[in-house]
Amino acid sequence: MSNDAMSNDDVIDELNKLIETCKDGEYGFRACAEHVKSTQLRQVFTSRADECRQGATELQTLVTRLGGKADTGSSATGTMHRGWVNLKGMLTGDSDQAALNECERGEDAALERYRDAVKKSLPDDVALVVQRQYEGVKRNHDQIRKLRDQMRSTA
């Protein structure tokens, strides 16, 4: 982190970007859950969607506490990605593998977004929340990658 403190508005903007990321993840995992055949994957995706929703809610609370207006929706990129997940799920015969591939792509984007955020000079209380959520995104990413690799090796 640099020593240059961020303005309150910049902190709110950064948190709102992370809220969009969480919402993208929530909706993406739910879309993937709708297309998989495996009950285990459906449960994993639903659980990840719930974690993303909880993360967004936590960040929205911080934004409100800082006097800002919290984002409540996802990004345009996330909406396009969900459309691609839906289309790909309908077109491919191996929807479980396709869903895992798409979820990993989504988690790659979330990981990059959080990696950028933890490098910023956020207030200590905000930085703690962002760092904790970043660790969760890394765990999600690793779990999805592991499931994807396991599925590839059994195919």
Predicted ranges, named:
Residues E112-A155:
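A generic hydrophobic-segment detector
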Residues D10-L18, T39-T57, D96-L100, D125-V137:
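Alpha-helical scaffold segments that form or flank carboxylate-/histidine-based iron centers
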Residues S2-I12, E34-K37, T61-L66, K88-S95:
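Short, charged, low-complexity loops and linkers
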Residues S2-E20, T64, M80-H81, D149-S153:
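N-terminal/domain-start segments enriched in small and hydrophobic, helix-friendly residues
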